[in-house]
């Protein structure tokens, strides 16, 4: 049986880590595409030369021609300018929209049967543009945001409580921006509600527990900017790459994982015609199901606010 083929569009920081992770997990043969000659070839050669040490058997190649992504099973798009300190994700829209147009046309021509995972910012707008230009069905075009935002939320909870990140379950919905919605009610450590653990940590001081949780939520919403501010020359790349690989692996290996995915909604959660982060089951058919659940009044208000921000951003491209 032929190996799967994974094409990565954009040979920058995220693209390089994506190529390495794809190889380490042996998800399939890897093509790293970039417009800069030599860059993707050099990165993939470097990773391939580690194969005897890391024990992986996949072919890696660099490309400067979209024809090389032909026959891809999955395409992950990271192409675009990264954020710099003081910039919001939305500040990138004009420049990255032009890049996304050309990328989407290349995918449509050479990988018409591929699943597409978009990472480029501003995510909600870029994935919308990609789906519109490719014309692919919505189950095959999705954005990576919620997996990363949820991972950040879970990490902050684990560090606050002094527990293993492996035991923390946390979900973040909505747009990939400052209005994202961490769902506090369902956050738990191996089934024990996080709020209950926080209250116990602070001697049953409910006000203090709420204050701490509010700080964790705020840090989650600004987590990308926190990394940008520290790096000064770019944005996060390890955690976004890991998050996209989790999605790709669930599709390629038909794992049926329930993950927060930026998906095109058709009435779910009361939203129609926009890409928003919601829980989805990812399997061999891409987005196989959008999983709805009830939101309380506060969560619904935050979700509505997040959707409004997404609509404003996406509509600004029209």
Swiss-Prot record:
CDD domains: LDH-like_MDH. The active site is at residue 176. It catalyses: (S)-malate + NAD(+) = oxaloacetate + NADH + H(+). It comes from the Bacteria. It holds the Pfam family Ldh_1_C. Keywords: NAD, Oxidoreductase, Tricarboxylic acid cycle. Its EC number is 1.1.1.37. NAD(+) binds at residues 10-15, 34, 96, 119-121. The keyword Cell membrane does not apply. One of its GO terms (biological process) is lactate metabolic process. Signal peptide: none annotated. Substrate binds at residues 83, 89, 121, 152. Belongs to the LDH/MDH superfamily. MDH type 3 family. Catalyzes the reversible oxidation of malate to oxaloacetate. This is Malate dehydrogenase.
